[in-house]
Design a protein with these regions (language model features):
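Glycine-rich FAD pyrophosphate-binding loop
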Residues: 12, 26-56
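A conserved short coil-to-beta-strand element within the FAD-binding core of flavoproteins
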Residues: 149-163
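Short beta-strand to alpha-helix junction loop
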Residues: 68-76, 114-138, 148, 293-300
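Core beta-strand elements of the Rossmann-like FAD/NAD(P) dinucleotide-binding domain
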Residues: 7-9, 169-178
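Central helical "cap/lid" subdomain
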Residues: 173-247
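N-terminal FAD cofactor-binding segment of flavoenzymes
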Residues: 47-101
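Active-site substrate-recognition segment that forms the wall
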Residues: 227-290, 307-315
Length: 388
């Protein structure tokens, strides 16, 4: 049972990805005086734009999720205002390196698919993708912000006009007047299998019939699906480059995806001359549970490592480095991209229960992309601020 002496905030935001951090960053810009707590299961901010560090190698930064994203030429004013300081500070920059396509024969050619070549080009964070979320959170402003990392919220309760959040063993808890979920895990049935939970936390917190807007959100999420990715991380060491430029990304065409069950490869230079490689592996469809996860991680690492010689045969300098390469494990992204049933924007905030939602799963032109995550956070921030 939670202690009676529980910290209380105006707003609890669960998830420190692009959406949650954009929400907080925009509230800051608007001069909000909210007392906010940010709760994140990972070690730091970033979500699917997170960056993996290594305890044994200082300076190693590997973007093991999204290596960058596209931005529309015309964005809403609030989104422009949010990103302008990041651009001027050099944290958000265009990635001018080449993006190429790989066919099923192992040949490389310039990429031309819409997913590999977003309109307006690729933008990335410097020195790493996680720098974007870090900058959004660190911007000076009026918001009072506390951060709680490496904490997975398991239990939600709605009582007496407040939310109570608790971790699995209830050793940590927090009270909040308002709640925002920037991901779907606590509201989606996938948590039942993936985490062996016996309930969907948000559904258990508010009985059906109490809040018709929230009922609509949860009903829609029951039908929504997302892609799973298994991302292999590799230290390639120092490459014997003789002035040649390596591509930033290698996207597999449809036939190559079918052959190798891989979406793309990402090459990332390190500050000490080494190179990192991330292979974005497609999912086999086998159920992910606490019992199967360890076996599936090992299985995917072995599968992707064994594919490397075929995948990089068109880059001799990378191929030659495989003998010295060190696999660094696999990152499983349980919901790397939503596929269907976007949440209508009018359901982003449910005032009866004081709960809101943001993320790339919100309906709009950016659905399924980083731009959608950012814009959903901005839109929700502006609504919350206007309602104060």
């Amino acid at each position: 049972m939670a202690s009676a002496n529980v910290a209380e905030v105006d707003l609890a935001v669960i998830g420190a990805g692009l959406a949650g951090c954009s929400l907080i960053g925009r509230l800051n810009q608007l001069g909000s005086d909210l007392n906010i707590a940010l709760i994140e299961a990972g070690r730091g901010p970033g979500g699917r734009t997170a960056t993996r560090k290594r305890r044994d190698q200082s300076g190693w930064l590997l973007n093991h999720g999204a290596p960058g994203f596209g931005l529309s030429e015309s964005m809403p004013e609030g989104m422009k205002a949010l990103l302008a300081p990041l651009r001027s500070a050099g944290v958000l920059q265009r990635d001018e390196r080449a993006v190429v396509s790989l066919n099923a024969q192992g040949d490389l050619s310039p990429a031309n698919s819409p997913e590999a070549c977003p309109v307006g080009g690729w933008w990335h964070g410097l020195p790493s993708m996680a720098s974007i979320c870090e900058a959004l959170l660190s911007a000076a402003g009026s918001v009072e912000l506390s951060r709680q990392f490496e904490t997975r919220v398991r239990w939600l309760k709605r009582r007496q006009g407040h939310w109570l959040l608790e971790n699995e063993d209830r050793t940590w808890s927090l009270r909040a007047k308002h709640l925002v979920l920037s991901g779907t895990l606590l509201a989606h049935p996938r948590s039942l299998k993936m985490l062996a939970w016996n309930d969907v936390p948000l559904r258990s917190a508010v009985d059906e019939g109490v809040d018709c807007s929230l009922d609509a959100v949860l009903s829609l999420l029951q039908r929504s699906q997302a892609e799973v990715r298994w991302n292999l991380m590799v230290d390639l060491g120092v490459l014997a480059l003789n002035g040649e430029q390596l591509p930033a990304q290698i996207w597999l065409d449809n036939d190559a995806k079918k052959r190798w069950k891989v979406e793309r490869l990402v090459l990332q230079p390190q500050s000490d001359g080494r190179w990192g490689l991330v292979v974005h592996g497609l999912d086999s469809g086998e159920a992910i549970t606490p019992e199967s996860q360890g076996r599936l991680m090992a299985q995917e690492q072995q599968r992707l490592v064994e594919l490397l010689p075929e995948l990089v045969q068109g880059l001799p300098v990378v191929s030659a480095a495989l003998s010295q390469a060190t696999p660094l494990g696999v990152m499983r992204w349980g919901a790397s991209r939503p596929l269907n049933h976007p949440l209508p924007a009018e359901l982003q905030w449910c005032p009866t229960s004081a709960v809101g939602f943001c993320g790339d799963w919100i309906e709009g032109p950016g659905f399924g992309r980083a731009e959608g995550a950012i814009s959903s956070g901005v839109n929700l921030a502006e609504r919350l601020h206007a309602d104060r």
